[in-house]
Amino acid sequence: MHTQINKYMENKLSIFLCGYRKGMGAQNCLLYLVNKWKLSLDRSDKCGILFTDLSKAFDCLSHDLLIAKLDSYGFDYSSLKLILNYLSNRFQRVRVNSDFSTWTKILTGVPQGSILGPDLYNFNSNDLFLFLALDVCNFADDNSPFTTAPNIPSVLQQLTNESKLLLEWIKNNQLKANPDKFHLILSEKNYSISINVAGFEIENQHSAKLLGINIDNKLTFDKHVSNLCFKASQKLHALARIRNFMSIKQSKILMKTFILSHFGYCPLIWMMHSRKLNNRINKIHERALRLVYKDDVSSFSDLLKKDNSFTIHERNIQSLAIELFKVVNRISPKIMEHVFPLKETLRYPNENPFVSFKIRTVSWGDGNLAYFGPKIWQIIPQEIRNESNLSLFKKKIRQWKPINCPCRICKNYVPCLGFI
């Protein structure tokens, strides 16, 4: 049933609906947001995003409204009756120690923990993109409208208008919003600026968390990466205490699971951070390798060779290459083609298939993956780029060491001249 419904609905769902869909995740959603924001900042535009909050969205979904929406999508009578039967006549009770409450009938919501629950919630949320005028960063019940404009007053006006439309959609869908928990981030240092949403003043903040990523108004991700480094450093101390009781193989498993794993969530979002933070990440990685191999003499590069591994930054570049491969071979989510647009025609063989962006600033343009990605694709060896199988490409790219990487972290810095 899950497979049949998703196959039928796949082309009916918005490409910007990123949650609970095959091949899509939070990283796709955030990449689209960050890409548009950086491109706008490079043009000297102003940007803003409104983070929203819903209360128990999965538990408040109206069964009758969902069935009506599925009917509009073309579900036949027997299918609608089957889904309504699946949702109806469910009961729940609460257990506290050995005491139980009385059984209560569930009148709204989708069964959480079920394979169909997230699908049905997606189908219910799909019309949100027709209701709103601005772009929306959407993942499950996280809906964050964002916009760009030549000046801050225009951004505020657009977000204010959009918040009214969003609250109206939430009300019409019998969901509950928490405007007092909304957050506003503008590409503006003046934190006294605010917008009014349902009687609540939402003030501009320096940063806020969206889908597990701390997003700041300058898109530096300094706070997010610093938090990752702090968490990884704490685990280093734990590894140091128990290292003598484990083999190298066991220590490597712990290093990858409890230390390096902190840098594995949505790495393409924050990978274009500062060189200072990259050095900090490398230092943590180096300390971890020294503990694993009990080696206080070898250099970081020698430790990597001994471990047959790459730096975190090199791994991130490899991950970026995999996303680019998916786009080139038309197997990526459609939303990624908005991040890495392809040329309509190629004039000669082995031409870079991605649209080249002209940038105006180093701060925003050079750090944008839409600009940086095509450059990375160009330095990948041709025999790897020409691979047609995703699994084989992943295997080869994970063995490829990026050489002559054009990013700010890898470039040489010359005083008075900058990065060359």
Regions found by a protein language model. Name each.
Residues M1, I5, M9, L33, ...:
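Mobile genetic element proteins and their domesticated derivatives, centered on retroelements
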Residues M1-P111:
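Conserved pre-catalytic core of RNA-dependent polymerases
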Residues Q4-L17, D42, P118-P150:
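Active-site palm subdomain of RNA-directed nucleic acid polymerases
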Residues K38-K46, L167-I185, K209, L268, ...:
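Short, charged alpha-helical motifs in flexible N/C-terminal segments and linkers
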Residues A57-Y73, S144-E168:
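Catalytic palm subdomain of template-directed nucleic-acid polymerases
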Residues N161, K176-S207:
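Short, conserved micro-motifs composed of acidic
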